[in-house]
Amino acid sequence: MMTSNILSRFLPPNGSPSVYETIRNHDATSDSSDVEERAGLTLEDGPGEHYSDRELEDAMADAGRSRLLDRDDAFISRRSPRKASVAGPSKSNSRRRHFSRPRWAHDASPSHDFEDGDDDVPASLLVEGHHDDDELKSRLPPPPTSHITPDDRQPSRPGPSTRGVRGRGRAAKEQQPLHHADRRRAPAVRWSLGQPNLNTVDPKEKAMWMWANVENLDNFLKEVYTYFLGNGIWSILLNRVLSLLTFAFVVGFSTFLTNCIDYHKVRGSKSLNDILIKQCTTKMSLSSTFLLWLLTLFWIGKAFQCLLDIRRLKHMHDFYYYLLGVSDTDIQTISWQEIVSRLMTLRDANPATAGAVSARHRKFMGSQSKQRMDAHDIANRLMRKENYLIALINKDILDLTLPIPFLRNKQLFSRTLEWNINLCIMDYVFNEQGQVRTLFLKDTHRKALSEGLRRRFIFAGIMNIFVAPFIVVYFMMHYFFRYFNEYKKNPSQIGSRQYTPLAEWKFREFNELWHLFERRINMSYPFASRYVDQFPKDKTVQVAGFVAFVSGALASVLALASIVDPELFLGFEITHDRTVLFYLGVFGSVWAVARGLVPEETTVFDPEYALLEVINYTHYAPSHWKGRLHSDEVRREFTELYQMKIVIFLEEILSMIFTPFILWFNLPKCSDRLIDFFREFTVHVDGMGYLCSFAVFDFKKGTNVINQGDRRDPARQDLRADYFSTKDGKMLASYYGFLDNYGANHRGSHPATRRQFYPPPAFPTLGSPPAGEMGTIGDRLDQTQTRHGLAGPFMGQQSVFGPSRYGLTGLGDHASPAPSILLDPHHQPSTSGFRGTSRAAGVQRYRSSRAHPPISGTIADGDESPVATGRSDPSRPAANAAGASSAGGVGTSDSNLGDSWRMNLVEDGDDDNTEGGENVDAIAGGAGVLGLIQQFQRVNKDSRGRTAVGL
């Protein structure tokens, strides 16, 4: 008794099961056909049985044949109920009848009867009724012709039926069968994928059959996209084979260098045989032998997996070639937009509708994900997990700082840490079908899920300690073998830079596929390098110039002496055991590195313009950068995201040491926020499942869904709107970027908004304004956004719940998007969403620091500019937008917008006065402040008879 009491203090109570057991029980008891519950793609009639599209297609075909039945046979069958009752059990128990009857025609279990009650149409109005309805069973279509047994093929005939007659008939059929037995077993071949006869089927028909029987569309589209990125079956197989050979070479050559050479004999030996260790593998240490066997088993497993994937790659090749019409030679040059267009064409060519199926199966077919498969849906499926990670990085929910006293402000996000985050968080939140577990969408299990996530972080940190040494050794050897020769030939490449993994996740937008993001980022590299070189490093340049001069002079003298007498001088030792060739290599490398630090003499320094060009491609510009693009603080922050390759590699190596500490101390503190994040930023889309709320674009509302906040007083912002919004305009930039990639021209973006790529010039070109004429940063941003048609770099926060923190930029001048053939009708962008955007706010957003006088004091002269009058009343955005749309229409400019607010009295003419009065009456409803002001001005006009000023 005492022992049990002691153990009960340490062991968990029986009433609190593990969170993993709760998740497994919840997944096991959930109905897989319920999209709201599991968002799955299969429908089970019983344990282990799955409905396929082929069975539904046969059901539809059988329904068509049932209309051709003879009415006399139907009438006779109703006149002999006793005969049917006698023969029924024997046929139902036969094996042949089991194959001929579709599984969807079986009696439904009572546990599923409640699903039909969820339909919008009452059961009394449905043609099919319920599963257990006898009338429905009588109207079920007959089995296919090839499935009918010989007994079923013979129609019933009137006449007496006795046991003797039936016995003689059966004996005659056994002696002389009317139909061969093979014809009765033939249909079983079509229902099984593993039958040998499937190899003789037409490849196009087989590809169509596999497309019709896709159960998990997320996994299928990932295979389609991976095949597209791999450039075909042969390129994928070649890449995998070369990867296996590279792994084997690195492991084998490293083992040879560390265990098979006696380095003590190198100095006095003259051949390789003198320093080789005979039978070195038998003399290896126990740890080296264990590691070698472990890597060998891993290599064998990868090779076996590569062999198994050949069949799957062949199926994907047939899908591309026969259904999409894309060969392996064309897949390297075709665009992804064209692939999406052909997928939508294939979807539209194979409708999955039927009129002779039950309500439950119609509901299943209506929720098939293949009906929701345009560019927006495909991107959401492919990036279902990545969109959440983009939002996590954007909202700074993950604490990635190093838990070290002198490095607490340093963020570390490497590929190793990214892999651990996917393992601990994504695999915990998502189930096997790739959907968010509904358990995370309920706040009742918040504490248990948070504790489970903490334990996963701690366990992953412990596992990293055991795995890190092996990974460090492999990556160091691989990096050395790959880049040493490149650095030896071109030493200046040591200083080459690259975006860090954290920068890539900061720059990547929602629903932006990897190849589109990679293309956009690659185009920014020349401008990023130019920006980093823009800052004059006067002290560094002077020292580097001196070092380059000295090293170059010494290398020149040695090279000249070698040319004069090469045979004598090349073997000449300058120091002990150091010849001229050695010092030529040393001085040449020092000169190359120092010369690379010295900029060209003709370089024009303009860091603001260079960074603006970078922002045009990265779409990343925090709000605190505004007005400070020339500062050294912004440069240091940008260089943290754009570091040298050698530094990134060292961080990857060091991250294998520091990752366990981040997993132990930092990330467990974020577990509560992570659980809340997935619960609060997950929405359900019919036919697709659960998605990140930021990745579901509202095309109908356009940019009007993003409200503009008061930039003058950030303290007045709604905290709830701040919480439910993205930082730095991420959602709006993603929206515009998506429309740019999948615009009206599906082979590229719209020609009007597409910007051609040019390498960065050494100085501002004719198309680039000089430094003296570029004006303030606000004007330059306005010019950049107008020229490129992209979302402004300083977009602040936007939310679907409330006003944003900072004013949006780049919206007023953005053209209304044209309809796209890559989007379904419910995803077509609405021009009204762009028409309603207030352009007065676009004029105001860069001049918000100027105080706005009250309305009572806005008495302007007649020659005042329309823009100034357009900014006279920022307190009425609704009336401003309405006035702009009524007077200027869709394409009105800022000057027209200002005119729409003016009450022209004499000089503008009677027509303008009448139109302006009618528009204001329509807006203000004939009363209110605007109506009183208009009446007051008309009274002044009639009484004084002279020109009044505009409002």
Curated annotation (Swiss-Prot):
Residues 1-54, 72-186, 810-919 are annotated as: Disordered. InterPro entries: Autophagy-rel_prot_9. Signal peptide: none annotated. Phosphorylated by atg1. Atg1 phosphorylation is required for preautophagosome elongation. One of its GO terms (cellular component) is mitochondrion. Residues 1-240, 311-456, 478-542, 600-645, 667-951 are cytoplasmic. The chain crosses the membrane at residues 241-261, 290-310, 543-563, 579-599. Residues 262-289, 564-578 are lumenal. Its main location: membrane. One of its GO terms (biological process) is reticulophagy. It comes from the Eukaryota. GO terms for molecular function: phospholipid scramblase activity. Residues 23-39, 104-114, 128-138, 171-180 have a biased composition (Basic and acidic residues). Keywords: Autophagy, Cytoplasmic vesicle, Endoplasmic reticulum, Golgi apparatus, Lipid transport, Membrane, Phosphoprotein, Transmembrane, Transmembrane helix, Transport. Forms a homotrimer with a solvated central pore, which is connected laterally to the cytosol through the cavity within each protomer. Acts as a lipid scramblase that uses its central pore to function: the central pore opens laterally to accommodate lipid headgroups, thereby enabling lipid flipping and redistribution of lipids added to the outer leaflet of atg9-containing vesicles, thereby enabling growth into autophagosomes. Homotrimer; forms a homotrimer with a central pore that forms a path between the two membrane leaflets. Belongs to the ATG9 family. Phospholipid scramblase involved in autophagy and cytoplasm to vacuole transport (Cvt) vesicle formation. Cycles between the preautophagosomal structure/phagophore assembly site (PAS) and the cytoplasmic vesicle pool and supplies membrane for the growing autophagosome. Lipid scramblase activity plays a key role in preautophagosomal structure/phagophore assembly by distributing the phospholipids that arrive through atg2 from the cytoplasmic to the luminal leaflet of the bilayer, thereby driving autophagosomal membrane expansion. Required for mitophagy. This is Autophagy-related protein 9. It comes from Aspergillus fumigatus (strain ATCC MYA-4609 / CBS 101355 / FGSC A1100 / Af293) (Neosartorya fumigata). The lineage of its organism: Eukaryota, Fungi, Dikarya, Ascomycota, Pezizomycotina.
